[in-house]
C-alpha cells in the first residue's frame, strides 16, 4: 500500500473520509464544484495540514521533510498562469532539482518520451509566458511526470493531479490519459480530481464521490457512478447506456 488516509478532514470544507491507495492504482475524486475534491487531494501532498492521519509508505506523512516528499510524490495544483519567464526546457529542468543525480542519458530518454506523449517536443524553446492555456497545462503535466518518472527517480510512488485535463482539447486529453496509464503501469499511484465523468468511468480503478464536503460513496466506477447517485449529487438528469461493450453517461439537461 502506498497511502492510508484515516479520517482525513478539514471542516467544513472536508468532513472525515478514509481510503487507501495502492501502487499502480488510479483514483479519481469526483463531485460538484466546491464539494471538497481539491481540499482532499491537496492534503495528500503533505503541504496542507488538516485533521486525521495519513500514512505514506509506512510513515506518517507529517514526518517527511520537503526534499523527501519532492522525490516520493508530485502534486500538480489546479491550473495557474506561469509566475516567471523561462524557456520550456528550463522550466522542465526545475523538476529534476529534487532528484539524486539521475543519469543524463536516462533523463534525456524520459524527457523525449514525456514530451512526445504530451505533444510538446516542438515547444521546448518557447518561453512559458507565450504558451496557450492548453500548451501551458501540458508543460506543467510534463514537469510533474518527469519529477516522478520511475526510470530517473526510483523513490517515486505517487502523482497527485488536480483537474489535469482542464484546458485540454479531446485529443490532448486522450494523450494525457494514455500517459497516466503508462505511469500507473510502472507502479506509480495516480490520484486526481476530475469533472469528466465518462473518463472517470473508463479510466479510474477507484472513485470517491464527494458532495458538500462529505464522501457520498467510494468504490469501483461502476458501483459508485450509478444514475441514482450521480443525479442526486449533481442535481441533473443522467442516463447510462452501453455502447460497444462500454458504459457511457449522457446528460440530458
Ligand atoms: N482557502 C480556502 N479558505 C476557505 N474556504 C475554502 C478555501 N479553499 C476552498 N474553500 C472552500 O472549501 C470548499 C471546498 O473547496 P474545494 O476547492 O476543495 O472544492 P472542489 O470540489 O475542488 O471544487 P471545484 O470543482 O470547483 O474545483 C468550497 O466551499 C470552497 O469555497
From Swiss-Prot:
**InterPro entries linked to this entry:** AAA+_ATPase, ABC_transporter-like_ATP-bd, ABC_transptr_BtuD, Metal_Ion_Import_ABC, P-loop_NTPase
What disulfide bonds does the UniProt entry report for this chain? none
User: EC number(s) in its UniProt entry?
Assistant: 7.6.2.8
What reaction does this enzyme carry out catalytically?
an R-cob(III)alamin(out) + ATP + H2O = an R-cob(III)alamin(in) + ADP + phosphate + H(+)
Where does it reside? Cell inner membrane
In the UniProt record, does the keyword Translocase occur?
A: yes
Which Pfam families does the UniProt entry name for this protein? Answer: ABC_tran
Task: State any GO CC term.
Answer: plasma membrane
| One GO MF term attached to the UniProt entry | ABC-type vitamin B12 transporter activity
Q: Which PANTHER family match?
A: METAL TRANSPORT SYSTEM ATP-BINDING PROTEIN TM_0124-RELATED, VITAMIN B12 IMPORT ATP-BINDING PROTEIN BTUD
Q: Which family does it belong to?
A: Belongs to the ABC transporter superfamily. Vitamin B12 importer (TC 3.A.1.13.1) family.
State the function annotated in the UniProt record.
Answer: Part of the ABC transporter complex BtuCDF involved in vitamin B12 import. Responsible for energy coupling to the transport system.
Name by which UniProt lists this protein: Vitamin B12 import ATP-binding protein BtuD
Give the organism the record lists: Photobacterium profundum (strain SS9)
Amino acid at each position: 500500500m502506498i497511502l492510508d488516509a484515516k479520517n482525513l478532514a478539514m471542516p467544513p470544507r472536508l468532513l472525515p473520509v478514509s481510503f487507501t491507495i495502492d501502487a499502480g492504482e488510479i483514483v479519481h475524486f469526483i463531485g460538484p464544484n466546491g464539494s471538497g475534491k481539491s481540499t482532499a487531494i491537496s492534503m495528500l501532498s503533505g503541504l496542507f495540514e488538516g485533521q486525521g492521519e495519513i500514512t505514506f509508505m509506512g510513515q506518517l506523512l507529517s514526518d517527511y521533510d520537503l526534499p523527501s516528499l519532492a522525490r516520493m510524490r508530485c502534486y500538480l495544483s489546479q491550473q495557474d498562469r506561469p509566475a516567471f519567464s523561462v524557456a520550456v526546457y528550463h522550466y522542465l529542468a526545475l523538476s529534476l532539482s529534487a532528484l539524486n543525480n539521475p543519469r543524463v542519458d536516462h533523463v534525456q530518454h524520459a524527457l523525449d518520451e514525456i514530451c512526445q506523449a504530451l505533444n510538446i517536443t516542438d515547444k521546448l524553446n518557447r518561453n512559458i509566458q507565450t504558451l496557450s492555456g492548453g500548451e501551458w497545462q501540458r508543460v506543467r503535466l510534463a514537469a510533474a511526470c518527469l519529477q516522478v518518472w520511475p526510470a530517473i527517480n526510483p523513490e517515486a510512488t505517487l502523482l497527485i493531479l488536480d483537474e489535469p485535463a482542464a484546458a485540454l482539447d479531446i485529443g490532448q486529453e486522450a494523450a494525457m490519459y494514455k500517459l497516466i496509464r503508462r505511469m500507473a503501469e510502472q507502479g506509480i499511484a495516480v490520484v486526481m480530481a476530475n469533472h469528466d465523468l465518462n473518463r472517470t468511468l473508463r479510466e479510474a480503478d477507484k472513485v470517491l464521490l464527494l458532495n458538500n464536503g462529505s464522501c457520498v460513496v467510494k468504490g469501483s466506477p461502476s458501483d459508485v457512478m450509478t444514475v441514482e447517485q450521480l443525479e442526486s449529487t449533481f442535481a441533473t438528469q443522467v442516463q447510462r447506456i452501453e455502447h460497444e461493450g462500454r458504459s457511457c453517461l449522457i446528460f440530458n439537461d
